A protein has these predicted regions:
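Conserved substrate/cofactor phosphate-moiety recognition/catalytic segment
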Residues: 24-117
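Conserved phosphate-donor/acceptor-positioning beta-strand/loop module used by diverse small-molecule
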Residues: 125-126, 141-155
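Phosphate-binding P-loop
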Residues: 1-4, 115-116
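The conserved Walker
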Residues: 12-13
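Conserved glycine(s) of the Walker
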Residues: 16
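Short, surface-exposed basic-aromatic patches at helix termini and helix-loop junctions that form
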Residues: 23-26, 137-146
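Short hydrophobic/aromatic beta-strand immediately N-terminal to the Walker A/P-loop
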Residues: 6-8
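Hydrophobic positions on the alpha1 helix immediately C-terminal to the Walker A/P-loop
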Residues: 20
Length: 155
């Protein structure tokens, strides 16, 4: 088995990360994870098909992960999910009330960490607003991944 790879495209909003990645997709950059794309898709369908990302992802583990998370609205903290989603094998049906950027970001976080465990190559983008993204790359290296960090900025 070849060495798994992670490609992180970092940069501010509007810098062109998604545009660059679209050019790279045909060049075997692994599964592409993008919270913005996922949020749009969830708002249209209210459904997440985990097999779209990989057959080895476990829907019940994702639900456990999501139900342990909260989101902040000003000074208020509330659960990420207002109700448990309906799960049928790899397909998860969310309440339209719960679908927002926080939910999409947490789903992508879950998939990223599962891919580390499963040693699956992938590419993702981030505004890199927290040092945990660098820690994630370090953790990936410790697990045998070859890591790439591309910083995209506009002038």
């Amino acid at each position: 088995m070849s060495q798994p790879r992670i490609r992180m495209f970092a940069g501010p909003n509007g810098s062109g990360k998604s545009t660059i990645i679209q050019y790279l997709l045909p060049h075997q950059i692994g599964t592409y994870l993008n919270a913005d794309d996922l949020e749009k898709q969830l708002k249209q369908t209210q459904r997440l098909d985990l097999s779209h990302y990989h057959d080895r992802l476990d829907a019940s583990k994702l639900i456990i992960f999501l139900t342990s998370k909260n989101k902040k609205h000003g000074d208020l903290i509330s659960p990420l999910l207002s109700q448990n989603p309906v799960v049928q094998q790899k397909i998860i049906q969310f309440s339209s009330f719960d679908i927002d950027s926080y939910l999409a970001a947490r789903i992508i976080d879950f998939i990223r960490f599962e891919f580390l465990t499963l040693k699956i190559s992938f590419t993702f983008e981030t505004v890199m607003s927290h040092e945990s993204k660098v820690d994630f790359l370090k953790q990936a290296q410790q697990k045998g991944f070859k890591t790439y960090l591309y910083y995209v900025a506009t002038v």
